[in-house]
Amino acid sequence: MKNVTDSFVSLGHWPSAGSFGFNTDILATNPINLSVVLGVLIFFGKGVLSDLLDNRKQRILNTIQNSEELRGGAIEQLEKARSRLRKVETEAEQFRVNGYSEIEREKLNLINSTYKTLEQLENYKNETIQFEQQRAINQVRQRVFQQVLRGALGTLNSCLNNELHLRTISANIGMLGTMKEITD
């Protein structure tokens, strides 16, 4: 503490200013010069420094504000993009579901129409088989009838002689006459 007070006391003892020149005593001149320079710098530089700091502060605030606005715009665009993405995903899901359901519906329609066609073909086949069976039965009947008729004619021709033939005709005429009398 004593050193500090001694330095202030030594400041009070100025050598007489008889001439202007360089003072080579660093300890005596530097604190005074430094205090004067610092005082002038603080007095005049305070406004300049304050203006520089205010300008810098304003630029930083403007940059922050612009960044916030850009950030807000980017967030808004991001939300719009997300919304569009959700909408497109929903539409894609609907198209996929509708496509699958349409495919399933077409598949069922195709299966049903194929089943109906097969059923119709089965019915047609059964009808054709029945028709062919009936036709074959009729042909067999005709052939059997023709063979029986030929056999009967052959038997009649071989068994019948003229006298038997005349008796059969007379008997038949007699039966017809009796039937006529009954009906009259």
UniProtKB/Swiss-Prot annotation:
Q: Which InterPro entries match?
A: ATP_synth_b/b'su_bac/chlpt
Give coiled-coil spans as residue ranges. Answer: none
Superkingdom field:
Eukaryota
The UniProt entry lists the main location of this chain as plastid
Which UniProt keywords are given for this protein, alphabetically ordered?
ATP synthesis, CF(0), Chloroplast, Hydrogen ion transport, Ion transport, Membrane, Plastid, Thylakoid, Transmembrane, Transmembrane helix, Transport
What is this protein's function? F(1)F(0) ATP synthase produces ATP from ADP in the presence of a proton or sodium gradient. F-type ATPases consist of two structural domains, F(1) containing the extramembraneous catalytic core and F(0) containing the membrane proton channel, linked together by a central stalk and a peripheral stalk. During catalysis, ATP synthesis in the catalytic domain of F(1) is coupled via a rotary mechanism of the central stalk subunits to proton translocation.
Q: Which PANTHER family match?
A: ATP SYNTHASE SUBUNIT B, CHLOROPLASTIC
Q: What is this protein called?
A: ATP synthase subunit b, chloroplastic
Q: Which organism is it from?
A: Nicotiana tomentosiformis (Tobacco)
- Gene expressing this chain: atpF
